[in-house]
Amino acid sequence: MNTIHVDVVSAEESIFSGEARFVALPGEAGELGIYPRHTPLITRIKPGAVRIEKEDGTEEFVFVAGGLLEVQPNCVTVLSDTAIRGKDLDETKASEAKAAAEEALKNARSDIDIAMAQSELTVMAAQIAALRKYRQKK
């Protein structure tokens, strides 16, 4: 069976390392699907869910808050400042953080404050969407 080695790494730890049949993740220009022997690629990724179809057919979900993707014919590497296993996502905390970001956006006075609040809001909305997608697959 053809597989591709996948590494998902955050600033703190390695979140996933193993063989997979397929990987899907949110690229900057849209959803990317990667199979073994994919053409080499380096691109930025948006906040969202990384779906890894493992060798045994089970799926692993990881939320990433953006980052970089490197694809080689036999290897996929996802680098993200923040990466959280699907099973570790907390919808209550994410919803509270999203509400705080919305409030910060309303009260923002400078361009920097607006940009920071918008960025946090985007990440939290993507985290909630990833959590819901993970729950549907369980």
UniProtKB/Swiss-Prot annotation:
The lineage of its organism: Bacteria, Pseudomonadati, Pseudomonadota, Betaproteobacteria, Burkholderiales. It is found in: Cell inner membrane. GO terms for molecular function: ATP binding; proton-transporting ATP synthase activity, rotational mechanism. It comes from the Bacteria. The keyword Ion transport applies. Belongs to the ATPase epsilon chain family. It comes from Polaromonas sp. (strain JS666 / ATCC BAA-500). Keywords: ATP synthesis, Cell inner membrane, Cell membrane, CF(1), Hydrogen ion transport, Ion transport, Membrane, Transport. This is ATP synthase epsilon chain. InterPro entries: ATP_F1_dsu/esu_C_sf, ATP_synth_F1_dsu/esu, ATP_synth_F1_dsu/esu_N, ATP_synth_F1_esu_C, ATPsynth_dsu/esu_N. GO terms for cellular component: plasma membrane; proton-transporting ATP synthase complex. Produces ATP from ADP in the presence of a proton gradient across the membrane. It is a peripheral membrane protein. The gene is atpC. F-type ATPases have 2 components, CF(1) - the catalytic core - and CF(0) - the membrane proton channel. CF(1) has five subunits: alpha(3), beta(3), gamma(1), delta(1), epsilon(1). CF(0) has three main subunits: a, b and c. SUPFAM superfamilies: Epsilon subunit of F1F0-ATP synthase C-terminal domain, Epsilon subunit of F1F0-ATP synthase N-terminal domain. Pfam families: ATP-synt_DE (PF00401), ATP-synt_DE_N (PF02823).
